[in-house]
Amino acid sequence: MDDFNLRSENPNSSSTTSSSSSSFHRHKSETGNTKRSRSTSTLSTDPQSVAARDRRHRISDRFKILQSMVPGGAKMDTVSMLDEAISYVKFLKAQIWYHQNMLLFINDHETTSSCTYSPGAGEFGPKLFGYDDDYAPIMDTYSQGVPLTVADSKYTPWFGSVDDEQEHVTYFKYRRATRHALRGHCNCIIGETEEFADQREKMEVQIEESGKNQTSPESIEADKAKQIVVLLIGPPGSGKSTFCDTAMRSSHRPWSRICQDIVNNGKAGTKAQCLKMATDSLREGKSVFIDRCNLDREQRSEFIKLGGPEFEVHAVVLELPAQVCISRSVKRTGHEGNLQGGRAAAVVNKMLQSKELPKVNEGFSRIMFCYSDADVDNAVNMYNKLGPMDTLPSGCFGEKKLDTKSQPGIMKFFKKVSALPASSSNEATNTTRKADEMTANVRVSPVKLGSADIVPTLAFPSISTADFQFDLEKASDIIVEKAEEFLSKLGTARLVLVDLSRGSKILSLVKAKASQKNIDSAKFFTFVGDITKLRSEGGLHCNVIANATNWRLKPGGGGVNAAIFKAAGPDLETATRVRANTLLPGKAVVVPLPSTCPLHNAEGITHVIHVLGPNMNPNRPDNLNNDYTKGCKTLREAYTSLFEGFLSVVQDQSKLPKRSSQTAVSDSGEDIKEDSERNKKYKGSQDKAVTNNLESESLEDTRGSGKKMSKGWNTWALALHSIAMHPERHENVVLEYLDNIVVINDQYPKARKHVLVLARQESLDGLEDVRKENLQLLQEMHNVGLKWVDRFQNEDASLIFRLGYHSVPSMRQLHLHVISQDFNSDSLKNKKHWNSFTTSFFRDSVDVLEEVNSQGKANVASEDLLKGELRCNRCRSAHPNIPKLKSHVRSCHSQFPDHLLQNNRLVARAET
């Protein structure tokens, strides 16, 4: 066969295919193996069915491509051409087998001169290379003309030189790529055409069975390429159907569009019908687009369940301006679901009010946000060019850190719709911004309290395989083994193996072995990126990262260790020294990052776990001299320690209340009613945040309800009361709420850590309203405050706290201040701020508890104390102004006054 004469052709040229095809047909004519004659099948042509029309276009495009690839395909009908394609794939498979095993033969028999080994005519076959006879029928059919003895003069030059071996490698790769391309096009045509179900079954059996013995890592990874379920998320008019049609057109991956508007034989159907159609499409080997609005978790949940080890679930969020969506919906005609005209505007508005943006922890492996037409075009092109064996990186991409305001309401926008330009999305975007500034905004309902915004995730590098030179095969086995062992213990938490190199061998090995064991790829997967910039650059949210450290737990040494210490700054080294000074091989140490650490602030990383693995590098300490029995044992211990450390973090965080990254309402020194600057700020910003919640609770309504009012309250001063009575309306600012208590951040904290513990009881406006029957509530508030102190001190053990009440509060609703005594805050600006926390105007919680228990009420101090001189809270030295006072406080290390050191008024860690 000319096809096997490697000297006569360039495998990288286009002529290779024609050469092999002519050889193939010449062989078939010589052996009398002719094609079976079949009648031509035609495709359905129903002009009323959009789905059928799209299917015809896709089949036609694929058919033309396949005709150009299959030898003689241009002159064949569909059935014959598919049959020929199947045979051609088998032929290529035989060639792959042949060239792959020639490499093995060369490695075993290579000499300095031509090879003299000559197997007999009956020996040249799979058994010669130690294989079963699985390929024997193929070789019997297609290998006639191949020399049966390698001593044949025409083919003897194949053996003995490196150049020849390289030709085998090149030819092997080329044939496999051609085979995969053919399989993809056959899958599309047969999968799209119901008439060819029997050909599909035949092709699957013949092609897939022929590939069972191909075990190279590259082929395993290719054959395991996953189908994709893509959920399009957006209101009517956001362009979901257009996205699908454009992405599917001329795509090399077989797709199916699932649209509820036409799922019932061209008519509107149900969610259940969409699920069934999606399931059927996946079984047929297609990836699917879910063309529904999918605006909230409930709508998405059942479609996400379609994912698993075999399928990836992606989300494409079409977050276009509301005006653009409304304008498109109103103006369009002939819509599949008949949602057009004036009715469409109201529907869009109603849907937007219940919108919940998707999160990775719902089960998505990839989320992509599109805020403009350009973003949408990029996403369309990405999915359009995605081949049958291609994959996309996991993570969250394109998300902008927008405020929590949703798109403006239709009733306030509708008057402007007619003025919206017909087609310019840029102008529409500008209009949106103006409308946002002119109209009140409605908040999007966030996830229910208690559900984590981010799935607990550990990102870890491969331990010991870089500088410590541990064997990659053995290391990959241990990684997969330990990951599989711990996943069942971690609940919803995830493990992510990270490497900086896209061509990383350890990532490929682990990915292939995890796939073989059917490990859930949503909970354990690989990721390419910088482990110190996973969120900012890769869109992957990880709260814990592992560091492959050295025994001294010191920066330096290059690699991951140096990168993590550099990114975290001196805070990590200081925090590490609190936990340990050295580390033994096989051990790990969990280090909480302080909130001041750059990794904590920029990447959301709360903990670093240092782990030390075994060393096989003779130039590094504790070299094991290639003792892999001990090395594997130590590496297993290292991963066990690492995953157990992560498990402890997950369990500890699950016991603590959810914290919000957003700040909350303030009530501290700046809340004193005489502080005009504070009042202006609060009226200007806080009123916007609580206006909607106060609409039904106006000041007049409250006063007319018969509830006790200890003073006349300004409107802004009612914010704490509103939050305490209705915490579910303020989930963006609430850190924790119980039956009797709500915890929030102080909007303008006067120290590094400053939270408020609010009582939820009516008629408790301030300390003067407290009576003995409220003692249990006060004790509960005190205990909750201590819990938050403990949490903050876990982050930074040097912090010292004080818990107490202002004698005369500036905001309605009894609240306990939990404040660190560093007073390091830009929000502390004047004398009233300082004196409200450092004089007897501030009543310690322990004293209030004693007074209420003994005398039935708490003592309150005069507001005149706020006008006193400025004195250091430690040494009590006097200072003329706030800047000089703050400068002194930063450097003052004097002991606190005696009265604060008594009765547990100060809460500090024992080692402080």
Swiss-Prot record:
Localisation: Nucleus
InterPro entries per record: bHLH_dom, Histidine_triad_CS, HIT-like, HIT-like_sf, HLH_DNA-bd_sf, Macro_dom, Macro_dom-like, P-loop_NTPase
Protein name: Transcription factor bHLH140
The organism's taxonomic lineage, starting at the top: Eukaryota, Viridiplantae, Streptophyta, Embryophyta, Tracheophyta
Keyword field: ATP-binding, DNA replication, DNA-binding, Metal-binding, Nucleotide-binding, Nucleus, Transcription, Transcription regulation, Zinc, Zinc-finger
ZnF start-end (C2H2-type): 870-893
Residue span, bHLH domain: 43-92
Record text on subunit structure and interactions: Homodimer.
HIT domain ranges (all copies): 720-829
Residue intervals of the Macro domain: 511-690
GO molecular function terms noted in the UniProt entry: adenylylsulfatase activity; ATP binding; DNA 5'-adenosine monophosphate hydrolase activity; double-stranded RNA binding; mismatched DNA binding; protein dimerization activity; single-strand break-containing DNA binding; single-stranded DNA binding
One term under GO cellular component: nucleus
Main location class: nucleus
Pfam families per record: AAA_33 (PF13671), DcpS_C (PF11969), HLH (PF00010), Macro (PF01661), zf-C2HE (PF16278)
Disordered: annotated segments: 1-57, 657-706
GO annotation terms (biological process): DNA replication; purine ribonucleotide metabolic process; single strand break repair; sulfur compound metabolic process
Residue spans of biased composition, Polar residues class: 657-666
